[in-house]
Regions:
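Short alpha-helical elements
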Residues: 1-206
Length: 206
């Protein structure tokens, strides 16, 4: 089995790319054509998020790991990922496919050991969220729990697992205190304007 087949198992389909491409931020001005396509780099980001591995382990078929990480980091800082999600929500709402029976839950992600004190000679991700101390600001979404450094994602999703809102907290944060905040973060703009929809028909939680 080739590495291409393994890497491409869950890449974007042509139909998904056709839906996604018009929503992406505009690229740089005309110049030397990029070595890797946006589709390659985005598939690389998606692969890395699914696999949960260091950026350096992203398969070469997606481009250099530095290019994959650079796109992720640039769009994260610019708020582009959140804007893309909102645009997809708008299209889904206009098509009437959002199921407003909403489920609220959370999942914990273990952080890499370098997350709270990365070395500065990595050639790429050299800027840690904080110093090597035990303290992490609340807005970094990183804290110590029984499993070590972890982050917790609190989500509200519809029946088809379509994300409607997400909050990131430190891993030791409880679910109940975030319940209202997760629901209050639901806001799906309407395609033709008007007030965004924020109220589910029903909420499921445990």
């Amino acid at each position: 089995m080739t590495s291409v087949a393994v890497a491409g198992r869950a890449d974007l389909t042509d139909a998904q790319w056709a839906r996604l491409e018009p929503l992406l931020p505009c690229g740089k001005k005309a110049g030397r054509p990029p070595k890797w396509t946006k589709r390659q780099l985005i598939d690389g980001i998606r692969w890395r998020c699914r696999a949960g591995v260091p950026w350096r382990d992203v398969p070469a078929e997606y481009g250099s790991w530095q290019a994959v990480y650079a796109l992720f980091r640039r769009w994260q800082r610019a708020g582009s990922w959140a804007a893309i999600v909102t645009s997809l929500q708008v299209l889904a709402d206009a098509a009437g496919v959002i199921d407003w029976q909403v489920s609220v839950d959370s999942t914990t992600a273990r952080a890499h050991p370098h997350a709270a004190g990365a070395r500065h000679d990595s050639g790429g991700q050299g800027e840690p969220p904080a110093g090597p101390s035990e303290y992490e600001p609340a807005d970094h979404g990183l804290g110590r729990s029984r499993g070590g450094w972890t982050s917790k994602l609190h989500l509200a999703c519809d029946r088809d697992c379509r994300v409607l809102s997400v909050l990131v907290t430190a891993g030791q944060a409880g679910d109940s205190p975030q319940f209202t905040a997760v629901l209050d973060s639901i806001s799906v703009p309407r395609l033709g304007g008007g007030r965004a929809r924020a109220r589910p028909d029903r909420v499921l939680a445990d």
